[in-house]
Every structure is written in structure tokens, then in C-alpha cells.
Amino acid sequence: MIVNISAKMILSICFTFLSFFKATHAMDLDTTSKTSICDATALIQGGMLDYYEGTRYGGTVGMFQSPYYWWHAGEAFGGMLENWFLCENDTYQELLYDALLAQTGSNYDYIPSNQTMVEGNDDQGIWGITVMGAVERNFTDPGDGKPGWLAMVQAVFNTMYSRWDSEHCGGGLRWQIFTWNSGYNYKNTVSNACLFQIAARLGRYTGNTTYLEVAEQVFDWLVDVGYVVLNDTANVFDGAEIDTNCTDITKIEWTYNHGIVLGGLAYMYNATNGTGEWETSLTKILNGAKSYFFKDSIMYESACQDYGTCNTDQRTFKSIFSRMLGLTSVMAPFTRDTIDDLIKTSAEAAAKSCNGGTDGHTCGLNWQKQTNDGYYGLGEQMSALEVIQNLLIHDRPAPYKEDNGGTSKGDANAGMNSSTTNVLQNNLNIKKGDRAGAAIITAVILSVLTGGAVWMLF
């Protein structure tokens, strides 16, 4: 039988084959080469910015397109800022600077007017962690009379800690800041973990031990309430409603909760010169993370990934988890061998997932598949970026401190107006089980903030 194949059909077949060849060979990663790593992450960042509004006509600087929320932007910029430092690549330096500054809010506390009605404690906390990265990496401080990045993180800390609620569940932050938002009666781990980590990092950076005391208070509460269970492979659960005194805990585990707690513990270990208490807790949390979130040493979101149920939020979680693993390996060097192996294996698999899309370097969700699994989006790009760039975490200086290379300008009173009490003006001596002093301060501050919130309703 003679088959007639037209020239047009032959060309079509050739183009299809070439496209397939390009896509399946798009990202060859050499995990020992900075050039290879940074070339790969440059492609991935380009894919992230396909979703960015800030460079479009009429778009909002510092925001990504729907369905991505404000906190996703904070998480994404945290990864891009690390790439700026680790790869020494200033391609997006101006974009990052403009984005971080555009979303500060008029009080420079990361409560911008465009988020006033919907922002939660976790949202503000994620941005606070990102800006703390700017502090520790000596990202160019704002000029023109604006506060430094350090002052902005201190404002985030002061405003978050002012919401500490001792009346329900013995302490802790609620998920939401404002009463009208769904979830106001839920106290979640991520909000409190963000406060814990920010306090730990501020304590290490500034040398002010009051921050460390607050960090210890927050971590003790997470353990006391049962959100963090310090068995040999520790659990970090999601949260609970105050209606049950936080006893009916949502026992779902996510990479970002583990990661943010892990990072906070690593900073506490470092800031206290390797105190055994923090080493023990850190070891248990790391054991839990390794047990729950790695399959064949490849990172995965165990609560949803195998079931195909990961939502937009959950598809971003591995990004901040990867960042925290990298920072932990620096802040607590005894964890380095374990973490480096996990990052290397996961980075290799993540790179292989970045062979999708028409560009040939769109990343996927399930790295175990060793190729793109059909998922794509900002979260997939963010996660691949962070795990791959953390191959370089030991090739650059450790996060700076105020007395060791840090340059950002601070203000311990940032975020607090004249009618509120700054927690750092009181040399708190917070012990486990002794919350009275903090409760009094919190009550004073909450009365002012509540008055402001009531005014906003009219």
C-alpha cells in the first residue's frame, strides 16, 4: 500500500517532535555548578513573572494575578530575594525593591490599605519573614526618609504581638486580625509560627534578648496547646477553634507549618549559642519533616499531593519549606548533612519537572514523576525555584547580624503609636506558664487597636 504524506504533514510531525525534544530536555541541572543552578533558576523566575501584575499596564505593583493572593506575593518575593543573594543576580533587584516598598502600608507595618478588610495574621507574618530576609541579606534599605527594612520588621512584630490573646486557649494569635473575617475564632499554627520565627530572627539580629523571650513564649504556647507535639518524629498540626478552648485540633500537617517552626527553632539555637533545649526540639521537628514530607528523599506535600487535591495555597507550601530547610542547615550546622541530601535529591527531581509548557521550562507539582505532571502555576514555579537555589546556601555568607555586617536601620518603637505600649520598652521576663505580664500589655494594646477597628466599621 502506498501512503501519500504531504510536505506540510511531514513538517508538522517534525515540529511536534522537535517541540517534544525541547520540552523533555529543557533543564539539565548540574547540582555542583553555580552557573547551572543560576541559569535554571533564571528560567524558573521568568515563569513566575508571567503571573506578575506589577509590570503590566494598570497592574498593581507587588501583586500577582488572580487566583493568587497578597500572601502568595510575599512568599514569592521571599524566594526571589534569596535568589538575588545566592546567585548574585541583580536582574530583578529594582522589581523586588519596588514591590516590597509598594506593599508596606502607610505605617510601614505591612498592613496596606488594599488589604485592610481581608488581611490575616498569617499574611502579615509571611511578608514579615520575607522582609526579615531583606534585612539579613543587606538588601538596599529604602531612602528618602523612609524606615529601613529592619524597622518595618519590628513594626510587623509589634503589631502582631499586640494581638496576643490570653483570654482564649491560654494565649496565641487568632488566624484573622479583624472580627468580620471568616476564621476569626480559629487559632492557627502558621500565624503563631510566623510570630515565633520573626521574634527569633529579630533577637539574633539585634542582640535584644526580649525578642528571644517572646519567641520562647510563643513556642511554649504551641507546645502547651498541642499544635506542636515533640515526639521523636514531631508533629506540627494546623490549629483549632477557640470555642473548644483549642482542644479539637485539626490534625493535618503541611510543609509550611513544619518549615516555619523549624526555621524559628534553628534561629533560636543559633541565637542562644547552641542551647541543648533548642537542639532537642529542632532535631525532633526535622525528624518529623523528613518522615512526613519526603518520599524516596524527594519532597512532597503529603496531605494532598498523592490525592490530587492540593489547592492554590497548598501548591506553594514547598517553597517556604525549602527556604527554611536551607536556612536551618546554616543556623544549626549539625543538621547540614541531613538537609543537604534532601535538598539535592529534591532539586534534581524538581528540575526534571520543569519541562512543561510551550516554553519547555514550566515546572510541575509532583516531583516524584521526574517529568512535568500537567500541573502549572505560580506555586509550582516558586517551589522549584527555592529548592534548586538552596543548593547554593553554603556558598554565600550566613544571614548577617547587626554587629556582624548588617546595615539596615531599625526602630524598636515601629508600628506603635504614642497611645500604645511598646513591648520592648518593658524588659519582660517571660517564663513558661507565666503569662501575666504579657497579658496586661496585650490588654492595653488590644483596647487601642479594637477602638481603631470599630472606627473602621463606620
UniProtKB/Swiss-Prot annotation:
Catalytic EC class: hydrolase
InterPro entries: 6-hairpin_glycosidase_sf, Glyco_hydro_76, Mannan-1_6-alpha_mannosidase
Lipidation (GPI-anchor amidated glycine): 437
Processing after translation: N-glycosylated.
GO biological process, one term: budding cell bud growth
Superkingdom as given in the UniProt entry: Eukaryota
Molecular-function GO term, any one: mannan endo-1,6-alpha-mannosidase activity
Cleaved signal peptide residues: 1-26
Membrane topology: Lipid-anchor; GPI-anchor
Annotated compartments: Cell membrane
Reaction catalysed by this enzyme: Random hydrolysis of (1->6)-alpha-D-mannosidic linkages in unbranched (1->6)-mannans
Annotated spans, Disordered: 399-418
Classification via Pfam families: Glyco_hydro_76
Similarity comment: Belongs to the glycosyl hydrolase 76 family.
Functional note: Required for normal synthesis of the cell wall.
Note: Present with 2950 molecules/cell in log phase SD medium.
The protein's name in its UniProt record: Mannan endo-1,6-alpha-mannosidase DFG5
High-level lineage: Eukaryota, Fungi, Dikarya, Ascomycota, Saccharomycotina
